[in-house]
């Protein structure tokens, strides 16, 4: 019997999608407010507030599949511990699916700020576009991505300015962003076998990939 864990379940959309397909899925999310929102939005789904780097979060051999999608893995500093935990939580023969990007080439600008949503604006830019400005009805939104390659760190800064009051709110996301090769080597060192790689270009996510990792029997 399948049992699926979505790490970094956020608003719960992936868990709900899997549940709608008849798959027993549950979510793990670090943010308690996100868990509350997901539970309100999808009361028929199961979500847990917890840390994927804490080994005691789940018992060994609990899941057949684990997913870690979008940029969740880049918010986790201790990726080695993350892989150890996923390996322990998976049953023998289980799968871990992780979402990674080419940090030098993926598109960090938002679709609504991209004048060529169906054709990557990056292809036609002389230099990589790493910032965007979007005008919404009542506020202006700015986003900027910076990468510090020597330290494997990235920062994504969002700034929102209210048109009426002039009030500014800023969210700064700190990402721990080594190369894909390094991350996959950590997974392999844990015992995972790389079974496949899916290029997400067909769904407009250029230089983003799903890696399928297998825990041997």
Question: Predicted regions span which residues?
Answer:
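Conserved class I S-adenosyl-L-methionine
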Residues: 2-8
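Class I SAM-dependent methyltransferase SAM/SAH-binding core
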Residues: 11-55
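A short acidic, Gly/Pro-enriched loop at the edge of an enzyme's catalytic core
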Residues: 57-65
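A short SAM/SAH-binding and catalytic strip from SAM-dependent methyltransferases
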Residues: 64-78
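A short glycine-rich, Lys/Arg-flanked "PGG" loop and its adjoining helix->strand segment in the class I
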Residues: 80-92
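Conserved beta-strand signature within the Rossmann-like core of class I S-adenosyl-L-methionine
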Residues: 94-100
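SAM-dependent methyltransferase
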Residues: 100-181
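C-terminal lobe and adjacent flexible extensions of AdoMet/dcAdoMet transferase-like proteins
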Residues: 174-217
């Amino acid at each position: 019997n399948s049992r699926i864990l979505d790490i970094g379940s956020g608003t719960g959309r992936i868990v709900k999608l899997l549940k709608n397909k008849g798959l027993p899925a549950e979510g793990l999310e670090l943010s308690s407010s996100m868990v509350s929102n997901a539970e309100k939005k999808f009361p028929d789904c199961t979500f847990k507030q917890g840390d994927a780097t804490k080994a005691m979060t789940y018992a060994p051999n609990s899941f057949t599949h684990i997913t870690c999608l979008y940029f969740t893995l880049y918010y986790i500093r201790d990726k080695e511990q993350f892989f150890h935990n996923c390996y322990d939580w998976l049953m023998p023969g289980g799968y871990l699916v992780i979402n990674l990007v080419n940090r030098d080439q993926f598109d960090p600008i938002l679709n609504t700020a991209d004048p060529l949503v169906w054709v990557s604006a990056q292809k036609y830019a002389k230099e990589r576009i790493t910032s965007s400005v979007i005008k919404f009805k009542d506020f202006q939104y700015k986003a900027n991505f910076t990468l510090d390659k020597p330290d494997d760190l990235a920062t994504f800064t969002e700034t929102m300015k209210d048109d009426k009051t002039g009030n500014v709110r800023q969210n700064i996301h700190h990402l721990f962003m080594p190369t894909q090769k390094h991350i996959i080597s950590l997974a392999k060192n844990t015992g995972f076998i790389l079974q496949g790689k899916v290029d997400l270009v067909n769904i407009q996510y250029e230089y983003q990939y799903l890696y399928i990792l297998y825990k041997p029997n």
